[in-house]
């Protein structure tokens, strides 16, 4: 009877291990997909930031456009 209990426990552990391996693989696929999506979003954010900076003129005049201070 103890052998049956031991075999049942071993079968239960093997079953749990199999389900855990499947879950780990599914999570790995999900994490990998999220990493790729985040990389795309970072690229889009960088491009949008560059476009925004290029479309908005700076309120600070360049050194050549600045008038000299009054003490010159």
Swiss-Prot record:
Disulfide bonds: none annotated. PANTHER family: PROTEIN SLYX. Residues 55-65 have a biased composition (Polar residues). HAMAP family: SlyX. Pfam families: SlyX (PF04102). This is Protein SlyX. It comes from Shigella boydii serotype 18 (strain CDC 3083-94 / BS512). Residues 52-72 are annotated as: Disordered. Belongs to the SlyX family.
């Amino acid at each position: 009877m103890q052998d049956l209990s031991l075999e049942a426990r071993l079968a239960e552990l093997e079953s749990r291990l199999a389900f855990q391996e499947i879950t780990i693989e599914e999570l790995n696929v999900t994490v990998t997909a999220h990493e790729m999506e985040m990389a795309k979003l970072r690229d889009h954010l960088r491009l949008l930031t560059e476009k925004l900076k290029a479309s908005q003129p700076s309120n600070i005049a360049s050194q050549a456009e600045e008038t000299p201070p009054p003490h010159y």
